[in-house]
Structures are given as structure tokens and as C-alpha cells.
Regions:
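Cyclophilin-like peptidyl-prolyl cis-trans isomerases
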Residues: 1-416
């Protein structure tokens, strides 16, 4: 099969050569460079194609799409040709973190990766936005085919869009081992039911090829995250106006009410609809906390997951017990999630006032959460011994608010 003709500056020869099936050959028909063709060899054969005097005129070999070539007819047209850049073509690029590195003539500088959302996968894209909330993607694992991040590994999401995982595709594992993990693909892979397509790299794919395990890359997204949660109603007015989004207040509509929910919830849907309803609550319902994730990875994960902080900006907990005489407030365990809460950061001879504690597997009632309003050197706020008490964080604002809550009340929490 021949494609052409175009004019070239090549010189023809009159030698006969043996060609294999799927060789791609440059031919100068009629021994003239005025009629230069590309020939696809469909079978092994011997012929004179007046090829240039180099490698029998063979410039490539077909490795994919052979069936498409066999289907082509004389009346078909090829309207566009684009290169597919493989990782091996850029793997030797220089990856530097030293900002004093001198650039030379001809150097190209790539500083971030831009990812465009798949608008049919709003939940998966929001999951990704939570992973990169500090603007970076940390590489927990890398292979020839992809890089991966484990920040929200274990957080289950429903199946959304299943497509071929092309080079530059960003996916979320929705089931099986590694559920909640996010991947960015360096090479093409087939689509599988366990991977939702979050979006695609639109700029900076060169960084994807050079980044190594335990390094970070800066990420920008289209659209950027849209969230009013934890803002006041007044601040949300200003924020949304700048984005060209219509704002409707709900719940407590006062200017200083704190937003704890928004509808639509997901960035992709808000960007599409250009309108947003926000639910406000009194500032008195709010508590700010600091969590010790490095010292209590399992317990902090548990707390964030059951409160909603794992994939949201504001979490909430329902008060199970509020014992004013003992200066204690407690929140009930979620048994399904509490399995495996091993002892981590234990109290040092006493539990300090306002420390957030979770009961661990050294006791029967695993996963209960408690806070004392005053120091205690005997028991944790869940009533357990110190050996069964993990200190996972502390309250940093809203102390009086917390004291006022009663059994059945909802406490809204935000990390500082």
C-alpha cells in the first residue's frame, strides 16, 4: 500500500531488495524525487522501489494498527498525523530541584503538570483534588507504566467512567487491592473495570516521565477546586462572585455563619451549572483541631474517615455522651472502620485537657473517641487505661463551644 506523492530532496537507486511484512519504505516512483511515496509492505517480497541508498529505504516497522492498514481502500484519506511520544524518548531528560541551575540555549523548562478533568467522573476528580490539596502530587510508587499516590488508599469510591488508560491518563482504583489509590500513566494500558478515568494530563507530561519515587510534582487542574466549606457566608459571596458563580444561602444565612455543606458538592458539577447553594451553621457549632498524623497514622486515618475529613474540608461527629460533672465529651465508635487500631501515641502519665483520644485494640471497646476538658492522670477520656488510649490530636479553637454540646448534638470540626 502506497501513500503520496510528495516532493523530496532524496536521491533514488535502482537496486532490488527483499522486504519483510510490515516494513515501512520510502519510495521514489519512476526514479524521481518529485514522486516520493511511503509504502507499507503487507507481505514478504522482493522489489525495486528506487529507494534512497540507506537501509533499503526502510524507515520504520508497523507495530500497531495493522488491521487498520489492511482495511484501507484507494478512496480513503489520511487527514491528520500526530506523533505519540513514548517515555523512552524523554527518560534521559534532566530532572533538577536546584533553582540555581543554569539554563543553556535550547533548554526547555517544565515546572508543573496540568490535568484536565473528565467531566463524567465528578466524584473521582474530587477524590484527586483532595490528594493534591497542597498543590503537589507525592509519588509513593513508580514503575515504567505509571506513578502512584497512596494518600487516600482504602477510601472506597463507586465506579464511574471506564476507558482505555492512555498515556497521561489519571485513574482512581475503585475496587480490590489498593482501592482509593490514584495513578498517572506513563504508557498506554487497556481499560479495566477497577479503574475510573479521573482526567488527562494536558501540559507538562515531561515531568511525569522524569519524576522519581518519593518526589513531588506541582499539579494544576482544569477546573481548579471550587469549595466554600469552612468559609463564612459573606466570604463565599466574594469568592463565588470572582468565579462567576451564582450564590444562594441556605440554613443560617447571616454573614458570619460558617458553611458546612454545599450543593452541588463536586467541583465539576459546580463549574458546569455556575450556581451553588451553601448551608450555614452558627459559629458556636464549630471546633478547630490539630491532628498528629505522623505519630498516629492508623488512628488519624480512622478519625478523618468517620468524620468526613478524609475527603472533605469540614467533618462532623454526633455526640454520644456529654458528662458535664466529669468534664468529658465522647463520640461513638464506628465498628466497621475501627478494626486494627493498634496502640500508637500513648499518654505520658496523664491526659491533658483538650487532647483528642481514641481507644485502641488493648481494650474491648475499640474506636471510641473522647475529649477531657481538664487534665487527668488516671484514665483516658473514653474511660480506658492509658495503654488503651491513643492521643491523636488536640482542640485548638472552640473550647467553650465544645463544652456546650449535649448528647445527640452534631459537632463540626475543621483541621487547622
Amino acid at each position: 500500500m502506497a501513500i503520496g506523492a510528495v516532493k523530496s530532496d532524496l536521491e533514488p537507486t535502482n537496486n532490488e531488495y527483499l522486504y519483510n511484512r510490515w516494513d515501512v519504505i520510502i519510495s521514489l516512483s519512476g526514479f524521481s524525487n518529485e514522486a516520493t511515496h511511503i509504502i507499507f509492505s503487507k507481505s514478504k517480497h522482493q522489489s525495486i522501489y528506487s529507494v534512497p541508498n540507506q537501509n533499503k529505504g526502510i524507515v520504520a516497522t508497523v507495530v500497531g494498527g495493522k488491521r487498520n492498514i489492511l482495511k484501507l481502500k484507494n478512496t480513503d484519506e489520511i487527514i491528520n498525523i500526530e506523533p505519540i511520544i513514548e517515555r523512552k524518548s524523554v527518560i534521559n531528560s534532566a530532572s533538577v530541584t536546584d533553582l540555581s541551575t543554569t539554563l543553556k540555549e535550547g533548554n526547555e523548562l517544565f515546572t508543573y503538570v496540568e490535568i484536565e478533568a473528565n467531566h463524567e467522573a465528578p466524584i473521582s476528580f474530587e477524590h484527586f483534588l483532595k490528594i493534591i490539596e497542597d498543590g503537589t502530587f507525592y509519588v509513593d510508587y513508580e514503575s515504567e507504566s505509571f506513578i502512584g499516590n497512596d494518600k487516600l488508599r482504602g477510601l472506597e469510591k463507586d465506579s464511574e467512567v471506564i476507558e482505555k488508560r492512555k498515556r497521561g491518563a489519571v485513574t482512581l482504583r475503585n475496587q480490590g487491592a489498593g482501592v482509593g489509590r490514584v495513578y498517572i500513566y506513563r504508557e498506554d494500558r487497556v481499560g479495566v473495570p477497577s479503574h475510573n478515568i479521573i482526567g488527562y494530563v494536558s501540559r507538562g507530561i515531561q515531568l511525569l516521565d522524569t519524576v522519581k519515587e518519593h518526589e513531588k510534582i506541582t499539579i494544576k487542574t482544569v477546573p481548579e477546586k471550587i469549595s466554600t466549606v469552612a468559609l463564612t457566608q459573606k466570604d463565599a459571596d466574594i469568592y463565588l462572585e470572582n468565579l462567576g458563580i451564582e450564590h444562594e444561602r441556605d440554613g443560617l444565612v447571616d454573614d458570619d455563619a460558617i458553611i458546612v455543606a454545599q450543593d452541588p458538592l463536586y467541583t465539576v458539577d459546580i463549574d458546569k451549572q455556575k450556581k451553588l447553594k451553601t448551608l450555614g451553621v452558627p459559629r458556636d457549632d464549630f471546633v478547630e483541631i490539630e491532628l498528629y498524623a505522623d505519630e498516629n497514622p492508623s488512628s488519624v486515618w480512622y478519625f478523618r474517615k468517620i468524620s468526613g475529613l478524609l475527603n472533605g474540608d469540614v467533618g462532623h461527629l454526633r455526640v454520644n455522651m456529654a458528662i458535664k460533672e466529669m468534664n468529658i465529651i465522647m463520640f461513638k465508635a464506628v465498628n466497621k472502620e475501627a478494626k486494627g487500631l493498634i496502640p500508637e501515641k500513648l499518654p505520658d502519665n496523664k491526659v491533658n485537657a483538650w487532647e483528642i483520644c481514641v481507644s485502641n485494640t488493648a481494650c474491648k471497646h475499640v474506636g471510641n473517641i473522647g475529649i477531657r476538658f481538664e487534665d487527668n492522670s488516671e484514665f483516658g477520656p473514653t474511660g480506658e487505661s492509658f495503654s488503651a488510649t491513643n492521643v491523636i490530636g488536640k482542640v485548638v479553637a472552640g473550647f467553650d463551644n465544645l463544652k456546650a454540646f449535649k448528647e445527640g448534638d452534631t459537632v463540626y470540626v475543621k483541621e487547622r
